[in-house]
């Protein structure tokens, strides 16, 4: 079981020389991938599991984070999330490589795990400890169950459809890519259909808003309040669900007082958070059809296991 879990965790892609092994161990790193040309020289490094990297065919992902764009209409700045969840959803069997320096290595590892990616994270010395902390957390919580989705999206593979998927993920609309309408989904979206014509794809935010309107907020399995830089995911568990919260601004600042609403009655909860105190949830309430709570502080990544 431990070997299977290790294989499912994001790995560290490290191109430093073997004399950096002590630095890796001190940071809490236990497993690395190295360029094939360096593999023989790394084999004798004690205290580390070393594999040869095979980057051919891997998809290069962006370093996750937040960019702030000027909003001319309101003379303010609007956060734009640089996230890769939509690309992972489009390539469920793909292999991925992040180039994520410093604290962004933690977010890259969390994003990869949250979306179920087979990923390696290339980082620098400043990223070693943040990466190791996330890996330690992922080992502690164990593997995720299957993702929960409200929307089945029939993807035609076009760039326009990709941008709509990206916006659905950013707006915390739980989407699953399907080849044909899935009766288990609350809403099926056929990109290019009469209801969702391709002509609207010239304005992807409008199409994402239209999809949200068809679903309705009342039927959404998961909603968050209080931040525009947090992406939430939901995975199934044997006796409940697991809520994933990714703060894409986590390399710069934490989020205080994030409110979460999950459809279903879940009187039991357990919080595991990276870079933040694992406090009890605040203002916890279980109503007739939903569970709500506030997480006091979110640094990079938090997982809330809810049970009946």
List PLM regions with ranges.
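A glycine-rich, often tryptophan-bearing local segment used as a flexible ligand/cofactor-contacting loop or short
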Residues: 188-224
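Extracellular/luminal ectodomains and secreted, surface-exposed scaffolds of diverse proteins
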Residues: 278-288
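C-terminal beta-strand-rich structural cap/linker in extracellular carbohydrate-active enzymes
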Residues: 192, 287-308
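Solvent-exposed beta-hairpin/edge-strand motifs
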Residues: 259-279
């Amino acid at each position: 079981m431990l070997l299977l879990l290790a294989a499912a965790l994001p790995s560290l892609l490290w191109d430093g020389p073997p004399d950096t092994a002590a630095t890796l161990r001190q940071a809490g790193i236990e497993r690395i991938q190295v360029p094939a040309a360096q593999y023989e020289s790394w084999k004798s490094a004690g205290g580390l599991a070393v594999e040869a990297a095979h980057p051919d065919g891997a998809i290069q992902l962006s370093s996750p984070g937040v960019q702030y764009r000027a909003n001319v209409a309101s003379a303010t700045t609007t956060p734009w999330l640089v996230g890769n969840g939509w690309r992972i959803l489009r390539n469920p069997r793909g292999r991925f490589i992040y180039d994520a320096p410093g604290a962004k290595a933690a977010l890259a590892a969390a994003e990869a795990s949250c979306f179920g990616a087979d990923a390696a994270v290339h980082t620098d010395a400043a990223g070693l400890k943040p990466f190791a902390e996330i890996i330690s957390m992922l080992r502690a919580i164990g593997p995720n169950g299957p993702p929960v989705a409200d929307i089945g999206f029939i993807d035609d593979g076009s760039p326009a459809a990709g941008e709509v998927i990206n916006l659905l993920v950013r707006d915390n609309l739980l989407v699953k890519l399907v080849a044909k309408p899935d009766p288990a989904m609350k809403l099926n979206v056929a990109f290019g259909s009469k209801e969702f014509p391709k002509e609207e794809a010239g304005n992807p935010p409008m199409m994402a808003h239209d999809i949200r309107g068809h679903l309705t907020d009342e039927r959404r399995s998961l909603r968050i309040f209080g931040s525009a830089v947090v992406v939430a995911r939901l995975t199934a568990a044997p006796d409940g669900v697991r809520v994933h919260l990714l703060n894409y601004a986590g390399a710069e600042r934490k989020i205080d007082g994030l409110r979460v609403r999950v459809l279903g009655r879940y009187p039991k909860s357990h919080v595991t958070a990276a870079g933040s105190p694992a406090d009890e949830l605040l203002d916890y309430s279980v109503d007739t059809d939903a569970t709500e709570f506030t997480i006091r502080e979110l640094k990079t990544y938090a997982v809330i296991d809810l049970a009946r």
